[in-house]
Amino acid sequence: MNLAWPSALLLLTAWAAQADDADKLRALGGGVFTKGGAVAEISLNRSRITDDQLKLVANFANLTDLSLEQTKIGDAGLANLTGLAKLEWLNLYRTQVGDVGLAHLAKLPRLQHLPIGETRVTDAGMAHIAKLKRLVYLGLRGNKIGDAAMAPLAKLPKLTGLHLGETRLTDKGTIQLTALGQLQKLWLHDTRLTDASVPQLAQLTQLKSLYLHRTRLSVEGVRLLQKSLPKCRIFYRSATVPE
């Protein structure tokens, strides 16, 4: 008996199961993309995927990119993703995910990009986010988070992009942001920031883009900030800083 046959049969069975799961995901309105013969990216944006059906995704061990934007996925669904050890990019924008679900994300060791704006996430969930030490981008736009969320986020050593637009952030919260000296892009538009935040923001010397439109900063305050950050393009009142 050829001992290689059982192994080959197992591989063939696993491949057939993945092919079947991929077909089911496509039937729900998703896109499944391969790289090097293995499924590496799945897009289910605006699809009919449910929490229970997300078990189909869990079978793709080589998955690096998963997008669930504008779906009904909630906390229970994220429990199905904890085995995706290679996942680097997870889009949860406009889903039903809340703080409980973030505890599941803390088990994804390679996660680097996490757009999770306009969800049910609050300040309480940031303690879980703080465990994702490889995060490069975090999008929290439109969530009910404020100054209390900043201390946990300040513990993310590789974060270069942070979206806090349309949140409850105030000048007090920017004090914690100074710990993120590696930030290159920062969205703070549609917040209650005033000129009192200028000294703190001026310490983020690696910034390349800063979005401050529809805040309470004055023209003079923004001009002063621009002088402190000459290499940063500041967007103010839907335009760049006035001359």
Annotated model-derived regions:
Residues 1, 19-20:
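Absolute protein N-terminus
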Residues 1-7:
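Bacterial N-terminal signal peptides that target proteins for export
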Residues 7-9, 204:
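N-terminal hydrophobic alpha-helix used for membrane targeting or insertion
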Residues 9-18:
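Hydrophobic h-region of N-terminal signal peptides that target proteins for export
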Residues 10, 23, 27, 227:
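Charged/polar, solvent-exposed surface patches and flexible loops
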Residues 20-36:
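Short N-terminal segments immediately surrounding and downstream of signal-peptide cleavage
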Residues 37-223, 228-243:
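Concave beta-strand-loop units of leucine-rich repeat
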